[in-house]
């Protein structure tokens, strides 16, 4: 091919084609007048189809489209064989917290949808753990309104964060199967299979998992109140799990069906060491305990969603749900308490706990549109019933050193509970001139809860538990909670803005009574009237930039455990007594969100502000006994609990588009109140002012064969308590890197290295550091690379630890947990895409 050569200049040869990367080669001027053979030139796919426009180059990390953040899956690289969980960890503002919950811009994702259809209802972990990354084209994050709000347009305040997965078109032509089997040292094993069939009008997914690597395929419906209930790593303890589930959806002309059923069984062994520093004005109170827990859980859930478009103006929605949980726990522990370096007590204990419970709920909603555009009427009915049964055996020996006495507890506790609740909502929307709408909403909720607790003490002579219950520790309790909600609002929608502004009036009433052998012991009645404005305002600066402000209030009743006036003496050093005098609480929240996307620089920014104030907040009053070192906790109502937070998420590409960045900043100030008292002194208000600041930054360099990331994070916590006049500071530093490299002969290597430094933790405010290194090597086989062999090494340096600090209004709690530790796995992953098969 003849070329017109610039005089005394190099020649830049570029070959491009729509949907492929551009080939570039610099040719020096010395080659002028000669023939050159460039050989075969390969162009690699690098296009993103947007409607009828193909944009060649790197897909933007995230794009803002009105109130939705759209993430392009192709802009993120994950190792071969990765699941959705590995992808969402890379999203700007996305993270998996210690409890395995998915957060986007600090908000918990309640549901994951696949092509707009619910996937295993309200269990996001089902998608995170079981859907392969390779099937996902886009991820859309947004706050979705409730079923009632979507049909009527009325704002009922029941939004939930949603992550909607867009499936690649070529994955909707048949069956897809992802089978994985793995074995490793220390007896580790993993077996999983996900079978999918996605079509435009139907979806079918069957999931099965079996492993002993802490990798539950579904969420556990109930984590018992063990030491593990907190913000800790998923890898805490040793967990064997097995699960099976099916998700089915289908759309007919007038009917939409969403359904799923899932079973999960777990066997968890967990050890922890905990130190508690109580906030007292005079004495220094420290307790230290070690515990060993063995827990087994069996969870069964079934959900369905049926939407029937009866005619062009009438719509019916029906949602039933059934949940069943059975669990047993075995616990043993040792505890010591000190006051000003003096040993006050020591306790050894062992407990057996078995329980079962079920919940059945129904939701029926009917919506009717009238001839005048915008006028509609809706009726929504919710009903639920529940039953629980628990049997506990507690044995402990506590020695008190000051008076040289010993207390032995050997008892059996039978807990039985049941209840029902219903809610009726009536909504009417009337159109007004100039595109305004007047909204009326009335809601009535009624809830009845019954709880029976009977305690039986051990008789040494009989060598059995006595037949008569302990009247001082036993009772029956009933609570009745009712609330009326009156809402009137005006809404409008314009080209640049829309708003919904109104007012809520919500009287709440809580009646409770405690009795034994049909003899009433306590009877209380509390009435509260709450008033709150409501606001939902959205302003669109452009298609890619918008501002939203939301303000609303919501009431909540105290739990039965907080209300029931009976002492739980399971642990004589930590006694808990319910308070039937509690009032319902009322929470006011204000949220401000700003989203913007710069098309030219492919930069996405999300800013959010959040303020919350709780009236009649349920908090704790802790009474400390300086003789025994024991604590008695009782819930009380208290005002002044509030928090405010702000977050910034920013991502995009540099001018050199091989480089990209992600940053997430978070700041929160929280004011927590409670009461502390020593012996029988007057209770003193204990306030904790807590500041949290976090900064996370990541830079990534990417070529066709290599992706290299450097990341860092700083987490700062500062707490001040007025009773102890004490300030605590902790710093958590993370510095790490990720490598993904495509080697010759089809090999792929990926590795991540993270250095952790934690300072200010523990009784002596010491620091801890550790280095975590994980690595994997994989190779694909067969003609279409359907078979993947993978060698994966976890915690190569054996330095993984788990430590958690929890700060309340009355104490600081530091805990260390056992972890899975170092091990390796060999996986075989078979991926079949049976195109066109039915």
Which residues does each predicted region cover?
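Conserved C-terminal beta-signal and adjacent last beta-strands/turns
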Residues: 694-716, 727-838
């Amino acid at each position: 091919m003849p070329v017109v050569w610039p005089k005394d200049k190099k020649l830049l040869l570029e070959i491009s084609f729509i949907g492929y990367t551009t080939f570039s080669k610099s040719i020096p001027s010395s080659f002028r007048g000669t023939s050159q053979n460039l050989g075969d030139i390969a162009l690699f796919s690098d296009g993103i189809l947007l409607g009828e426009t193909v944009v060649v180059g790197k897909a933007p990390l995230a794009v803002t489209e009105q109130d939705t953040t759209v993430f392009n899956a192709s802009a993120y690289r994950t190792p071969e064989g990765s699941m959705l969980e590995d992808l969402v960890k890379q999203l700007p503002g996305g993270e998996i917290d210690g409890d395995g919950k998915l957060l986007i811009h600090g908000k918990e994702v309640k549901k994951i949808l696949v092509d707009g259809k619910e996937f295993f209802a309200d269990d996001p972990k089902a998608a995170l753990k079981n859907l392969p990354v390779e099937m996902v084209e886009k991820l859309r994050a947004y706050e979705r309104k409730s079923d009632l709000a979507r049909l009527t347009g009325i704002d009922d305040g029941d939004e939930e964060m949603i992550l909607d997965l867009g499936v690649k078109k070529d994955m909707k032509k048949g069956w897809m199967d992802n089978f994985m089997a793995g074995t490793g040292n220390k007896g580790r094993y993993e077996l999983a299979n996900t079978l999918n069939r996605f079509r435009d009008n139907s979806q079918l997914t069957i999931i099965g998992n079996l492993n002993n690597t802490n990798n539950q395929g579904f969420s556990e419906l109930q984590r018992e109140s063990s030491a593990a209930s907190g913000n800790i790593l998923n890898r805490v303890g040793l967990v064997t799990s097995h699960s099976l589930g099916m998700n089915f959806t289908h759309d007919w002309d007038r009917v939409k069906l969403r359904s799923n059923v899932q079973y999960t069984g777990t066997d968890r062994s967990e050890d922890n060491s905990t130190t508690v520093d109580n906030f007292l004005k005079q004495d220094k109170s420290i307790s230290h305990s070690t515990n060993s827990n063995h827990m087994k859980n069996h969870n069964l859930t079934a959900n369905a969603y049926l939407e029937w478009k009866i005619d062009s103006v009438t719509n019916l929605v029906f949602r039933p749900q059934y949940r069943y949980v059975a669990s047993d726990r075995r616990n043993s522990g040792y505890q010591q308490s000190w006051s000003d370096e003096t040993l006050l007590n020591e306790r050894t204990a062992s407990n057996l706990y078995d329980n079962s419970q079920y919940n059945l709920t129904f939701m029926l909603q009917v919506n009717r549109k009238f001839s005048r555009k915008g006028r509609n009427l809706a009726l929504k009915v919710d009903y639920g019933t529940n039953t629980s049964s628990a049997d506990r055996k507690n044995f402990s020996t506590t020695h008190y050193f000051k008076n040289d006495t010993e207390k032995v507890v050997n008892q059996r506790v039978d807990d039985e509970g049941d209840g029902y609740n219903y809610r009726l909502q009536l909504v009417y929307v009337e159109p007004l001139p100039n595109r305004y709408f007047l909204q009326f909403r009335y809601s009535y909720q009624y809830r009845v809860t019954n709880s029976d607790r009977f305690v039986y003490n051990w008789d040494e002579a009989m060598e059995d538990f006595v037949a008569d219950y302990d009247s001082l520790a036993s009772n029956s309790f009933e609570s009745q909670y009712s609330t009326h909600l009156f809402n009137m609002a005006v809404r409008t929608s314009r080209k640049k803005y829309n708003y919904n502004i109104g007012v809520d009036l919500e009287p709440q009433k809580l009646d409770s009574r405690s009795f034994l052998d049909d003899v009433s012991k306590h009877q209380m009645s509390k009435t509260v009237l709450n008033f709150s404005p409501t606001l939902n305002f959205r302003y669109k600066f452009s298609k890619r930039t918008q501002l939203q402000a939301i303000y609303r209030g919501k009431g909540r009743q105290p739990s039965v455990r907080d209300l029931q006036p009976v002492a739980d003496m399971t642990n004589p050093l930590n006694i808990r007594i319910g308070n039937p005098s509690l009032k319902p609480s009322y929470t006011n929240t204000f949220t401000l969100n700003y989203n913007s996307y710069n098309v030219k620089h492919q930069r996405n920014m999300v800013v959010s502000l959040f303020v919350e104030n709780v009236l009649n907040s349920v908090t704790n009053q802790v009474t400390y006994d300086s003789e025994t070192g024991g604590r008695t906790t009782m819930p009380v109502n208290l005002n002044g609990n509030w928090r405010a937070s702000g977050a910034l998420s920013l991502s995009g590409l540099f001018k050199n588009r091989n480089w990209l960045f992600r940053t997430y900043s978070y700041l929160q100030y929280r004011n927590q109140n409670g009461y502390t008292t020593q012996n029988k002194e007057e209770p003193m208000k204990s306030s904790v002012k807590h500041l949290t600041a976090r900064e996370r930054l990541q830079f990534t360099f990417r070529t066709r064969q290599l992706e290299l990331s450097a990341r860092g994070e700083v987490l700062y916590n500062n707490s001040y308590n007025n009773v102890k006049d004490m300030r605590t500071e902790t710093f958590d530093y993370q510095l790490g890197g990720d490598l993904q490299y495509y080697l010759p002969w089809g090999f792929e290597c990926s590795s991540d290295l993270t250095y952790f430094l934690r300072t200010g933790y523990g009784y002596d405010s010491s620091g801890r550091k550790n280095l975590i290194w994980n690595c994997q090597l994989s190779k694909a086989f067969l003609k279409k690379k359907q078979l993947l062999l993978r060698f994966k090494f976890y915690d190569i340096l054996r330095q993984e630890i788990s430590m958690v600090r929890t700060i309340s209004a009355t104490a600081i709690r530091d805990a260390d947990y056992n972890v899975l530790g170092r091990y390796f796995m060999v996986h075989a992953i078979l991926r079949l895409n049976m195109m066109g098969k039915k």
